[in-house]
């Protein structure tokens, strides 16, 4: 296994991915705005993509890069559908805070 990608050690990429993942998880746990929560979920997905690409390059396999392509496509669809739902709820409730979105309550 090659321990360097373009002269940078693999563990640097993995540490960066862990930092990005942690920021994303903290954003999901702390934020109240639905848009910011979606952005935090995108950070989580991008950190996972970074891990896939890192191991794909290190092991000289293309499988990780193919998986990243599909994850990005699914993330784009998730963002489009999620933001459409947030906009629809915002038109009704006049807020995008998830604490105040209680459409399922009577």
UniProtKB/Swiss-Prot annotation:
Lipid bilayer topology: Multi-pass membrane protein
Catalytic activity reported: a quinone + NADH + 5 H(+)(in) = a quinol + NAD(+) + 4 H(+)(out)
Root EC class: translocase
Record flagged with keyword Chloroplast: no
GO-annotated biological processes: ATP synthesis coupled electron transport
Pfam families: Oxidored_q2 (PF00420)
Subcellular location: Cell inner membrane
GO MF terms held by the record: NADH:ubiquinone reductase (non-electrogenic) activity; quinone binding
Family matches, as InterPro entries: NADH_UbQ_OxRdtase_chain4L/K, NUOK/Mnh_C1-like
TM regions (residue ranges): 10-30, 35-55, 67-87
HAMAP family (UniProt xref): NDH1_NuoK
Protein name listed in UniProt: NADH-quinone oxidoreductase subunit K
Organism name: Leptospira interrogans serogroup Icterohaemorrhagiae serovar Lai (strain 56601)
The gene coding this protein: nuoK
